[in-house]
């Protein structure tokens, strides 16, 4: 939580210059401290529905040990669901109508599976636009993850994602470009982020649309950017919410697709994820799978537990820090009535007072 500058100590001014959140006493006195209500628009397919819930709930819950968070999951009825996932949604999720009536302080929008290159033809397209447009006028800040970033960049900023020559898949080093922005204050200036995508929006596209790039990788491209006002829309291209084993699960799925004939090539390793010994084990497993298929036998199971024990997580702490900063900033400027966007005196075009709107 931020420090209140209750006197003229020069350290307060110095910390402000470094990007630290320092509150003026008058501002602090008018804050209405209460619980925060965060919406989670979960558009992930059935197999990843509950895992995605856990990943984002975990990040939110770990971001601050003092504040109280109510997370409200919902989805779009236009997304096709199987019986089990549909029952889960009907029992535990709220409707968008209920979300809209009650209001939110913040909104997170997940990625989704797509059936073709044109996002505008996907069943979620129009209802997603409705949610995002409502959130822009009624929610303090919206965080878009991966494909949601690409969709919002297309319909709100006119920037279409571009197909990559090969899937950007693995764990990549990143650096903070805007060190004084409050979203990345006091996090590591260099850190890792997982990526898993076939498409990209470039640095030039973000900047050309008036957005601000905060975190980037030479190998993986832009990870974190914000809307022209500096805060009301936050964009991830990577997956900082991923569990340690998330990429392993994806690799296992792709091996299964190869074994079932759904893909013609054996999947490559995610970049910078498996160690030397693990790669040796998986190379041996690949030979066994191919040999079994050639002989008409059932392929051996991937030794998932053995592999998982050797994996390292090099991104979660920084992800927790960024989400913690995001939640803290929302706490400072959101209205005490969650059906309204900002507390009195906040400029919607520059809510953090960064003069970047």
Swiss-Prot record:
Residue numbers marked as site, Important for acyl-CoA specificity: 113, 147
Any Pfam family: HTS
InterPro entries documented for this protein: Class_I_gatase-like (IPR029062), MetA_family (IPR033752)
NCBIfam families named among the record's database cross-references: PRK05368.1-3
Cell compartments where the protein resides: Cytoplasm
Catalytic reactions on record: L-homoserine + succinyl-CoA = O-succinyl-L-homoserine + CoA
Active site feature: 146 (acyl-thioester intermediate), 239 (proton acceptor), 241
The enzyme's E.C. designation: 2.3.1.46
Annotated Gene Ontology cellular component terms: cytoplasm
Keyword Amino-acid biosynthesis: yes
Protein's UniProt name: Homoserine O-succinyltransferase
UniProt-annotated site: Important for substrate specificity, residues: 196
A Gene Ontology biological process term: methionine biosynthetic process
Pathway participation: Amino-acid biosynthesis; L-methionine biosynthesis via de novo pathway; O-succinyl-L-homoserine from L-homoserine: step 1/1
Described function: Transfers a succinyl group from succinyl-CoA to L-homoserine, forming succinyl-L-homoserine.
GO molecular function, one term: homoserine O-succinyltransferase activity
SUPFAM superfamilies registered for this protein in UniProt: Class I glutamine amidotransferase-like
Positions with a binding annotation for substrate: 167, 196, 253
Top EC class of this enzyme: transferase
Family affiliation: Belongs to the MetA family.
Keywords, comma-separated and alphabetical: Acyltransferase, Amino-acid biosynthesis, Cytoplasm, Methionine biosynthesis, Transferase
Matches recorded under PANTHER family: HOMOSERINE O-SUCCINYLTRANSFERASE
